[in-house]
Design a protein with these regions (language model features):
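GST-like domain detector, emphasizing the conserved glutathione-binding G-site
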Residues: 1-112
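Residue-level "edge-of-site" marker
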Residues: 20-22, 163, 186-187
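Phosphate-coordinating loops and pocket residues in cytosolic domains that bind phosphorylated ligands
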Residues: 30, 175, 184
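Phosphate/oxyanion-binding loops and surfaces in catalytic or ligand/nucleic-acid-binding neighborhoods
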Residues: 61-65, 153, 176
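GST-like fold's C-terminal all-alpha helical module
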Residues: 77, 81-175
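Long, charge-rich low-complexity segments
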Residues: 185-194
Length: 194
């Protein structure tokens, strides 16, 4: 979702191909053998198959809302925060959402471990309106889809936690035009080879 958010805000033209991960098209596997989404094939022949790389690529082409940090060292700090999120929070999120996949009876321990990371976001949001600063930006788009997944796992529990700024931030994201646009359902792409 974060790659689609950046592609949308950048206005870069691209062809969206929705695929079923249970039946990955050969055309996709030829360009990105790892078989995960998203994958962006650029006209130069370059293949980007990491969502953050796609975000940077799209916003370097056009960043009308100023999502990319411009202050010295700000992008490095932003990428470090997202890396921490991806390595720590997402690990716990997956085990909280899908404990059976990891041989667990329940995911409460991982819910609580992920919550500790979310409290760092709450602290940041107490100082400024968005994670990126005075306006929505790269850091917000980089983590919001995963915070949404976490909240949706048990929304009643999430809403009862003492993180009002985080909850407001998430609701604003869920009610945004960008979110509505990227959540639009696309028909599955069928390869002409099929």
């Amino acid at each position: 979702m974060r790659a689609r958010l950046a592609l949308r805000v950048s206005g870069v033209s691209y062809e969206h191909r929705e695929v079923a991960l249970k039946a990955k098209p050969d055309a996709m596997l030829r360009v990105s053998p790892k078989g995960t989404v998203p994958v962006l094939c650029v006209s130069t022949g370059e293949v980007l198959d990491q969502s953050l790389d796609i975000m940077v690529w799209a916003l370097e082409h056009n960043d009308p809302e100023g999502w990319l940090p411009t202050a010295p060292d700000a992008m490095a700090e932003t990428q470090a925060l997202i890396a921490d999120h991806d390595e720590v929070f997402k690990l716990h999120l997956d085990r909280y959402k899908y404990p059976q996949r990891f041989g667990l009876l329940e995911g409460v321990h991982h819910r609580d471990a992920a919550a500790a990371w979310l409290f760092t976001l709450q602290e940041r949001l107490q100082q400024q309106p968005y994670l990126s600063g005075p306006r929505w930006g790269f850091l917000d788009a980089g983590v919001a889809p995963f915070v949404r997944q976490y909240a949706r796992t048990d929304r009643v529990w999430f809403d009862a936690q003492p993180w009002p700024k985080l909850a407001q931030w998430l609701v604003a994201f869920e009610n945004s035009d960008a979110f509505a646009a990227v959540m639009h359902k696309h028909p599955l792409w069928v390869s002409p080879e099929a």
